[in-house]
């Protein structure tokens, strides 16, 4: 079990998948949201939670005032845990899409998001994550001002952000590195 750190559901526990996931620690999640909320008010934002695992990142965003979160998870067991966590917390604005992150992002959207949270398994190659970041911009997911946060192992190669993103300072917590960037201009 892990818990929601802040907002209306702060302190409430959520389930985590039994195997095969690496939930973001409370310390890293709290730091991530402190970094983002120092620059952005989450109230009313649209959020995309990629490689959602237990849904902890997206649920934290909803608890802190985000209007909507689209959770994307390919593993059926993890997706079932996310669905149970959404129901248990009773937070509105949550949508769960089961499927491979690359396929969902490639399908595109007409509703860009304000915040992208991505916590890919550490064994996902950095080049694959780079491709997802590029596809976010070309498939309508981002707009000027969209912030993206990617959690990686410190042993993983640093990400190569596509043109049009301004990197924020990365943060390291033990074996975890947070890479952050802001979209400078609208999709082309």
UniProtKB/Swiss-Prot annotation:
Residue ranges, annotated region (Linker): 17-24
Notes on how activity is controlled: Phosphorylation stimulates DNA binding and DNA methyltransferase activity, but does not influence secretion. Exists in a compact, folded state at both pH 7.5 and pH 4.0, the acidic pH that mycobacterial proteins may encounter in the host lysosomal or endosomal compartments. The protein is more compact and stable at pH 4.0 than pH 7.5.
UniProt xrefs under PROSITE patterns: N6_MTASE (PS00092)
E.C. number: 2.1.1.-, 2.1.1.171
GO BP term (any one): rRNA methylation
Region of interest (SAM-MT-fold), ranges: 25-188
Gene3D superfamilies the UniProt entry points to: Vaccinia Virus protein VP39
Annotated phenotype, changing residue 3 to A: Does not show any significant binding to either DNA or RNA in vitro and lacks m2G966 methyltransferase activity in vivo
InterPro entries, alphabetized: DNA_methylase_N6_adenine_CS, RNA_MeTrfase_RsmD, SAM-dependent_MTases_sf
Coiled-coil intervals: none
Reaction(s) the record says it catalyses: guanosine(966) in 16S rRNA + S-adenosyl-L-methionine = N(2)-methylguanosine(966) in 16S rRNA + S-adenosyl-L-homocysteine + H(+)
UniProtKB keywords: Host cytoplasm, Host nucleus, Methyltransferase, rRNA processing, S-adenosyl-L-methionine, Secreted, Transferase, Virulence
Record has rRNA processing as a keyword: yes
Localization of this protein: Secreted; Host cytoplasm; Host nucleus; Host nucleus, Host nucleolus
Any further remark recorded for this protein: Can complement rsmD-deleted E.coli cells.
Domain notes: Forms a two-domain structure with a short hairpin domain at the N-terminus and a large C-terminal domain with the S-adenosylmethionine-MT fold. The N-terminal domain helps target recognition and is important for binding RNA and DNA substrates. The C-terminal residues dictate the nuclear localization.
Similarity comment text for this entry: Belongs to the methyltransferase superfamily.
Function, in words: SAM-dependent methyltransferase that binds both to RNA and DNA. Specifically methylates the guanine in position 966 of 16S rRNA in the 30S particle. In addition, can methylate and modulate host cellular DNA within an infected mammalian cell, altering the host epigenetic machinery. Binds to specific host DNA sequences and methylates cytosines predominantly in a non-CpG context.
Listed name of the protein: RNA/DNA methyltransferase Rv2966c
